[in-house]
């Protein structure tokens, strides 16, 4: 008997005993190379432009399942057909990803000039820090056109890491706080637009202290509930420790916020140019950031993995050719 579930954690333990569903296979979401192969399959029946590259599309869709990738390809074909194109272009695939991830554009939603300036500086702050910090996720696209429930949207390229260091977490938090830091530095006031950013950094800082043991005052400790359930009325630490945790979380966030403001101040001219481009065109891409700040000084993990995979494929082909040659001689 075969069965599938995406919530194995809530199954009755009796179901998993020997002689029942005693053999389990965990199917993870496809990684970079697997997404590239899946795109290759779904692109075959579509008339695509020469600019479309399965590797590029795979890098733009981290966390997508096989069904999500099929949906992207179908949506891109529909967008191209609506615009009367003979071939599906790279732009159509990017618009398809945007629509699936962020929802429909809502150009009918009117924003004031002051709101547009605030959103542009906020998003340019994220983009600037993401480009300048080694471990932050680099920009793919930013728009100030309302999409879904949001007044603007940004897409970044997260690195699919197996492990994460303290420095990587700090860079991610610093880039996330770049939006609010830019508002304070440029406009002299802050807005509610950073609420989601603050939620993310608070969770990250809390995890660093409570789960990852990355706090200076509470090093190498992990406060967890061994039952696997959410904490109820009690927590596995004292009130004194709880206060110390709050202090450490606030300290980590303050350090990265000050760091974000410092980097933005040092790159004030570039950030200002980026915000102006965003106001003028309503959308910016990684090429625009590269034009202002230059190429990133670091190779991404995704690029490194692709290069390693190409080397492995080349070595496998070389070995296969040698075996075939040896068989031919015998």
Regions found by a protein language model. Name each.
Residues 107-118:
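Short pre-active-site segment immediately N-terminal to the catalytic Zn-binding motif
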């Amino acid at each position: 008997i075969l069965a599938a579930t995406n919530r194995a954690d809530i199954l009755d333990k009796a179901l998993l005993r020997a002689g029942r569903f005693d053999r389990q296979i965990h199917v993870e979401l496809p990684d970079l190379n697997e997404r590239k192969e899946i795109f290759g399959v779904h692109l075959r029946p579509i008339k695509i432009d020469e600019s479309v590259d399965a590797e590029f599309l795979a890098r733009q869709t981290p966390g997508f399942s096989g069904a999500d990738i099929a949906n992207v390809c179908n949506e891109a074909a529909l967008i191209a057909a609506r615009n009367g194109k003979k071939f599906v272009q790279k732009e159509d695939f990017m618009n398809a990803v945007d629509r699936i991830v962020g929802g429909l554009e809502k150009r009918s939603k009117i924003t004031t000039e002051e709101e547009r300036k605030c959103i542009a500086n906020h998003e340019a702050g994220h983009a600037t820090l993401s480009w300048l910090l080694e471990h932050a996720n680099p920009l793919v696209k930013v728009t100030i056109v309302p999409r879904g429930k949001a007044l603007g949207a940004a897409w970044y390229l997260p690195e699919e890491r197996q492990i994460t260091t303290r420095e990587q977490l700090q860079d991610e938090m610093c880039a996330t706080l770049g939006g609010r830091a830019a508002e304070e530095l440029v406009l002299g006031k802050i807005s509610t637009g950073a609420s989601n950013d603050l939620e993310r950094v608070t969770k990250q800082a809390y995890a660093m202290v409570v789960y990852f043991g990355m706090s200076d005052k509470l090093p190498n400790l992990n406060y967890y509930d061994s039952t696997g359930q959410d904490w109820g009325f009690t927590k596995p630490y004292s009130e004194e420790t709880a206060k110390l945790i709050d202090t450490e979380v606030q300290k980590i966030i303050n350090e990265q916020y000050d760091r974000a403001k410092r980097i933005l101040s040092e790159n004030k001219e570039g950030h200002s140019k980026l915000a102006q481009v965003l106001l003028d065109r309503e959308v910016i891409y990684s090429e625009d950031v590269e034009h202002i700040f230059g190429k990133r000084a670091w190779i991404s993990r995704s690029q490194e993995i692709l290069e390693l995979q190409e080397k492995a494929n080349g070595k496998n082909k070389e070995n296969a050719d040698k075996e075939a040659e040896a068989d031919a001689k015998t």
